[in-house]
Amino acid sequence: MSTRERQISTTVLVIGTGGSGLRAAIEVAEHGIDVLAVGKRPRQDAHTSLAAGGINAALGTMDEGDSWQQHAADTIKESYLLANPHTVEIVTQGAERGIRDLERWGMDFAREDDGRISQRFFGAHTFRRTAFAGDYTGLEIQRTLVAKAEQLAVPILDHVYITRLLVRDNVVFGAYGFDQSDGTRYLIHADAV
């Protein structure tokens, strides 16, 4: 096993290269900020790729009466009132933008004959709001996000398992981990993690 160590500095470190991590890294890169994404799995094989059912947003493509407010109400009800209402509001208000971003970046959503994104019922929804790509929605989301991150030249470290956050005076300033394939240690300093 190697005892090599790499030291890296970046403005923003994103830990995780699944859907959320890559989406965050893309947002940072689009604002012209130096970002590094680190994932313990190969970028094409993050857990997002296993999601099959679809992704929810009140687009109104199938049911014009749908809204982010109804999406939020359905989410809170289905959580048995355990979901944080503020978080639910943020997620449901931003869901349409997420779908539109994926669409703009080339995601191959299922479509109706007239070209609208197809949506179906899923879970406890009042309206049809699950957009999908066959039964491989998560894989298509992951492929789309990886392609966009690569287009923006976001550096991605695969197979690096983060074991420790670096903290001083209650401020996180980096992370420490190792490459699972060759043991190389990584010391990553960042202004934001």
Predicted features by range, described:
Residues 23-25, 60-61, 130, 190:
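Residue-level recognition of conserved structural "scaffold" positions that shape functional pockets
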Residues 18, 192-193:
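Extracellular/luminal Protease-associated
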Residues 3-4, 40-184:
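Conserved N-terminal/central alpha/beta ligand/cofactor-binding core
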